[in-house]
């Protein structure tokens, strides 16, 4: 019987063939943490009395959740982590402004077939390039950094096929929300979701990263796009790397399969207060909105910024709008393309390299009674500020059209 991509990656990492349900030790290819979780990881290592990293070439730190530090406690945490990084000579260190950890892993480090573990639930993002990527808690992360290994229960492989091409106004976010509408939050617990794209060029890396990012929202242990010509092209264009990635065997067996006809999707939103409270934007059009956030590790990429700029060139925003590209590199590209100028002239506040309001940290949290539209990943009560506020999740085009009109708006009339 053939093997799935998950089984191939984890069998290699375990040094033996593994099957779903096996509990086994695996070797980790890439490990990472950010400022908010990193100080907990370092505390665990200090308590154990072993502040060391098994392979500094395979370890990444990024300051993003508390960047730039909004208070003295955040600054204190970053001071501690800078000292830690210097003490062990961390090579892959990204200070304030470089970008959000998951975007940096995607841009600079993760590769197809790797096992990637990081101290954040949205580590699943880098499954976009064909890696098995999973979030870990502080204790497990400390053990990984010290040994380069971790234990894992091998998840069941689940296949999602993406066929045809997305219609105008439909992006990766809508695919993620569609999956949530079908399987609900945590509906794919214990599964490694493998996604197969029928027409690779019609579903680019930015879209894939959004779906993989939100894999954790539908419960997946990992959300891995099966590498194809788009994967190879992306790595060649972005990093000058030529890869021959592994793929599933033709006779691989999955616990179940599901097919999404991309051409039949429409722009979707997740209404308050759950990621699986999914509705077509056409059903909620007209609801007044106070604030729009475009950014995060979910939707702060170049195609998101392009979509927002294309819509917002039509006028001035009627709802306050904050735009945060996910990395310095993306900000620079958006600047060169004229998107930053367009967004600024439309009345948006544009910054970069921070998680900011997505976790209710800073750079634009919502107040009591306010309604927001966000391109982020979560809309639980209190996630982006006041628990008395409401958050709708949407793609960047929907968010931009909403900012332009000051009310929830179907973006297709602007595209």
Curated annotation (Swiss-Prot):
GO terms for biological process: L-leucine biosynthetic process. One of its GO terms (molecular function) is 4 iron, 4 sulfur cluster binding. Gene3D superfamilies: Aconitase, domain 3. It is an enzyme of class 4 (lyase). Its EC number is 4.2.1.33. Heterodimer of LeuC and LeuD. Belongs to the aconitase/IPM isomerase family. LeuC type 2 subfamily. Catalyzes the isomerization between 2-isopropylmalate and 3-isopropylmalate, via the formation of 2-isopropylmaleate. This is 3-isopropylmalate dehydratase large subunit. It comes from Caldivirga maquilingensis (strain ATCC 700844 / DSM 13496 / JCM 10307 / IC-167). The lineage of its organism: Archaea, Thermoproteota, Thermoprotei, Thermoproteales, Thermoproteaceae.
């Amino acid at each position: 019987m053939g093997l799935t991509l998950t089984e191939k990656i984890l069998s290699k990492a375990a040094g033996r063939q593994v099957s779903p349900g096996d509990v086994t030790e695996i070797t980790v290819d890439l490990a990472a943490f950010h400022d908010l979780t990193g100080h907990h990881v370092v505390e665990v290592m200090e308590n154990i009395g072993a502040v060391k990293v098994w392979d500094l070439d395979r370890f990444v730190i990024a300051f993003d959740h508390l960047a730039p530090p909004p208070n003295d406690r955040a600054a204190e945490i970053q001071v501690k982590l800078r000292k830690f990084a210097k003490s062990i000579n961390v090579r892959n260190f990204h200070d304030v402004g470089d970008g959000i950890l998951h975007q940096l892993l995607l841009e600079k480090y993760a590769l197809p077939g790797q096992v990637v573990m990081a101290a954040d639930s949205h580590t699943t993002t880098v499954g976009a390039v064909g890696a098995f990527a999973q979030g870990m808690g502080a204790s497990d992360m400390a053990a990984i950094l010290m040994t380069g290994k971790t234990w894992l229960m091998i998840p069941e492989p689940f296949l999602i096929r993406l066929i045809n091409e997305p219609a105008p106004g439909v992006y990766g976010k809508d695919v993620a929300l569609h999956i949530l509408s079908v399987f609900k939050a945590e509906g794919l617990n214990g599964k490694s979701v493998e996604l197969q794209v029928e027409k690779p060029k019609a579903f680019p890396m930015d879209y894939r990263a959004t779906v993989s990012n939100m894999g954790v929202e539908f419960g997946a242990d990992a959300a891995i796009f099966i590498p194809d010509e788009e994967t190879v092209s992306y790595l060649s264009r972005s990093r000058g790397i030529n890869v021959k990635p592994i793929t599933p065997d033709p006779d691989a067996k999955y616990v179940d399969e599901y097919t999404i006809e991309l051409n039949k999707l429409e722009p979707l939103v997740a209404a308050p207060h759950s990621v699986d409270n999914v509705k077509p934007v056409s059903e909620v059009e007209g609801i007044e909105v106070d604030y729009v956030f475009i950014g995060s590790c979910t939707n702060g990429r170049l195609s998101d910024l392009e979509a927002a700029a294309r819509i917002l060139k039509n006028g001035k925003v009627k709802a306050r709008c904050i735009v945060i590209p996910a990395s310095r590199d993306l900000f620079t590209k958006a600047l060169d393309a004229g998107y930053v100028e367009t967004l600024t002239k439309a009345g948006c506040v544009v910054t970069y390299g921070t998680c900011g309001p997505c976790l209710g940290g800073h750079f634009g949290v919502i107040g009591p009674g306010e309604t927001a539209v966000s391109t982020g990943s979560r809309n639980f009560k209190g996630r982006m500020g006041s628990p008395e506020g409401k958050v709708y999740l949407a793609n960047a085009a929907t968010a931009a059209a909403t900012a332009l009109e000051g009310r929830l708006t179907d973006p297709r009339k602007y595209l």
